[in-house]
Amino acid sequence: MDSINIKELNDRIQQESSFVDLLTMEMNKVIVGQKHLVENLLIGLLANGHILLEGVPGLAKTLAINTLASAVDAKFSRIQFTPDLLPADVIGTLIYSQKSEQFQIRKGPIFANFVLADEINRSPAKVQSALLEAMQERQVTIGDETFKLPEPFLVMATQNPIEQEGTYPLPEAQVDRFMLKVVVDYPKKEEERLIVRMNNSGEFPKASPILKPEDIIRARQVVRDVYMDEKIERYIVDIVYATRTPEDYGLGKLKNLISYGASPRASISLSMASKAYAFIKRRGYVIPEDVRAVCNEVLRHRIGLTYEAEAENVTTEQIIAEIINAVEVP
């Protein structure tokens, strides 16, 4: 790709990504701190991928996606997952009307642009798979009719850390459908003081709608057009391959710590998330730093740890760090 095209593309990205700062400012009006969370929400939104959030209750996970939906002027719904939830409670069902003596379709809360699946690991596998199928297919079948889900469609699922009681861990195949897994941490001291002050004063700012859903659909197309060199493609595939055969990259010590590596879906997600990150940084091309910036979020839920790794308290983040240090940067 010649430099003229890259310059044109860069100018176009500069123009098209001007809303990113406005959207971030709008969200920061409502959410104190959690910059990492806000950034990853934008990456998921622009890369057309769903997000899994892990963190203890009370860290503004619900508030974050609700605020994003308000700023994009889109429909938001929240599904609280509980042990007695049924698939019909998520996707919808047929209701018999005595008046018309016919079955009528009642759509479930999945029919929204932004869906918060709260505490997804509190529900049995049957309900989890109904949601994850809708995420993958972007359509839902009720009775014998199939309905397309609205665009843009973004699911943000939250889960409590597995140590907490009464949880059903998500199977690996289903976790793989989430583009990003973001670990949400506690706010800093100063931020928490500001949160307390805002609550004491009773002043709760609201996000104003600054975008339309169509703007997001257009921005996604621009993100796809962000230029990725073949060297960067090879770099991404090398990182993912190193999770499967670490010994080929001089990381023999990791072989006994990894039970399974990341799937090809990880390579696709890493590529799209890197493009979205470059777009957020107002660049028309991907550089290795973009790939490294999103590596943890894309790979942390796609690498299986052996019992040996768990016994030694090795985390997937440590394994990813070793891989990034070992794989040659283009």
Model features per residue range: what roles?
Residues 12-17, 30, 167, 181-253, ...:
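Conserved C-terminal "switch" segment of AAA+ ATPases
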Residues 45-82:
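Walker A/P-loop
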Residues 56, 90, 158:
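P-loop (Walker A) phosphate-binding loop of NTP-binding proteins
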Residues 13-59:
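Pre-Walker A (pre-P-loop) alpha-helix and adjacent loop at the N terminus of AAA/AAA+ ATPase modules
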Residues 1-14, 246-330:
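C-terminal engagement/docking regions of AAA+ P-loop ATPases
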Residues 88, 109-136, 150, 165-174, ...:
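Conserved AAA+/SF3 P-loop NTPase catalytic/coupling segment centered on the Walker-B
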Residues 40-43, 96-116:
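Conserved alpha-helical scaffold flanking the Walker A/P-loop in AAA+ ATPase domains
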Residues 104-113, 142-159, 170-179:
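AAA+/SF3 P-loop NTPase mechanochemical coupling elements
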